[in-house]
Amino acid sequence: MKKYLKYGIMGLIILAFALIRPRPQQENSPNGIRDYAEIVRSGVLRAVTEYNSVSFHIQDDTLGGLHYELLHAFAQAKGLKVEITPEMSLEKRTQGIQDGTYDILANNVVKNSERKDSMLFTHPILLSRQILVQRKPQEKNDSTYIKSLLELANKTIHVVKSSPSIIRIQHLSNEIGDTIYIQEVERYGQEQLLAMVANNDIDYAICDENIALTSAHHLPLLDIETAISFTQFYSWGVNKDNTVLLDSLNTWLEEYKQTASFQELIKKYTLN
């Protein structure tokens, strides 16, 4: 049981942080979705993100993260305050955008056919890939070590529940002509899956490359050399009816991405 204690502690920290956040109250619009004018009138922008070393985190009693800093830069430019809620469940983050609990889904969101009908996506913010996470071989003929994606046949890969990587794994299964078993994990985020691989709790996981690269410094037993996807554009998401907010975000992003401040943030929080 002790080996699972660390994951429970991670979950409790995230839960405690979420509980002390003020609960967003839906207002004004009959469908619960605040348009940009309502956001401006309220003076508060509500965002949801994943708690991890890239998006949003606490270090030495200080809040930080790429999306944390981007959100504050946007809010400052628009004269708004920002409320950020950490939520480990991708499903709950997405549902919160759809029902108006949050205005912006501010983490690395991949635009795909399943999501394009449920939300709108900003212009791309950064590039990344999905990486197979496994342990480095402990001996010459380590049977669990994957040298080629073909060797994933009949293996079980753990992913965050509703992760876009599920579609890629399914396509990969078709490409190699054999079954790849997918185990969706609702309770933990990507960094927790990395720790579980490192501690022999599971053998394989899929993770965003930037998160994997950041975590690999603390988990030297991990192998993160095998990509399962091409490089993809990552964006933010907003409700499909919130076109004015989308336009405001896109206009600001296109200007901000040309600044030295943006380049410094990318260097600070990604290792690509």
Predicted feature descriptions by range:
Residues R46-V54, T62-Q76, L132-D178, Q183-G189, ...:
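Bilobed "Venus flytrap"/periplasmic-binding protein-like clamshell domains
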Residues Y51-N52, L126-Q134, E139, Q190-E191, ...:
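Periplasmic-binding protein-like
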Residues Y68-Q76, E91, Q95, D99, ...:
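Solvent-exposed, polar/charged alpha-helical surfaces in well-ordered, non-transmembrane soluble domains
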Residues F121-T122:
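Short Trp-Ser/Thr-centered turn/loop motifs at beta-strand boundaries
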